[in-house]
């Protein structure tokens, strides 16, 4: 299956109306493949462009016993198969500079986790791959302080950049969304994504793991589209209550089509676009 070049992919993302969607972690190949096909079908029905997302290693879990994923080698094998069989581009994250090159052999978009958004060596390594790079804004970072991350990527020779808003720390075990961050970060000349599922997370809220309030996902996602966001990030799962990672804030896969149609309708409104 032919996939877009990095330049073509970034141009498509800059044209707005897209989603990055999939399970939090690659917990099971069949679940991931089922989700990828469902994401593609729901996105096509809503007239949206889709990218499959999932992590091969969740390095910043709350507990030492938390599920992390299949690891680099198996994770890349799974993502390569999903990419080929679903026809969707894929996005996945890296945590160390040396992971950039092997991940770039498979991933269309390399993602920098929120907690690592200031790590210069990581950003430079991701930029050096030539892939689209999605940097998630740290929960502790002001929107205007993401400009240096963009400048680091550009200084390393990469203009294919996305920034993602995923909520800001609001006291202990809670996040809040300031939608002013969307136009602020768009002002850096890059497309901006809104992470509707991590924004309803309650970090560490369950003691040994994070909680979440998935019932708020639709209203936060709609608000982001109304605020002019370019794309929406959604973690989804066939059975969120049984997911091995971020289940409390993941969106049920069978409810994805309806949500995407709502977002598509909002994107179509002239005053939003």
Curated annotation (Swiss-Prot):
It is found in: Cytoplasm. Its main location: cytoplasm. Keywords: Cytoplasm, Lipopolysaccharide biosynthesis, Transferase. Pathway: Carbohydrate biosynthesis; 3-deoxy-D-manno-octulosonate biosynthesis; 3-deoxy-D-manno-octulosonate from D-ribulose 5-phosphate: step 2/3; Bacterial outer membrane biogenesis; lipopolysaccharide biosynthesis. It is an enzyme of class 2 (transferase). One of its GO terms (molecular function) is 3-deoxy-8-phosphooctulonate synthase activity. GO terms for biological process: keto-3-deoxy-D-manno-octulosonic acid biosynthetic process. It catalyses: D-arabinose 5-phosphate + phosphoenolpyruvate + H2O = 3-deoxy-alpha-D-manno-2-octulosonate-8-phosphate + phosphate. One of its GO terms (cellular component) is cytoplasm. Its EC number is 2.5.1.55. The keyword Nuclease does not apply. Coiled coil: none annotated. PANTHER family: PHOSPHO-2-DEHYDRO-3-DEOXYHEPTONATE ALDOLASE. Belongs to the KdsA family. HAMAP family: KDO8P_synth. This is 2-dehydro-3-deoxyphosphooctonate aldolase.
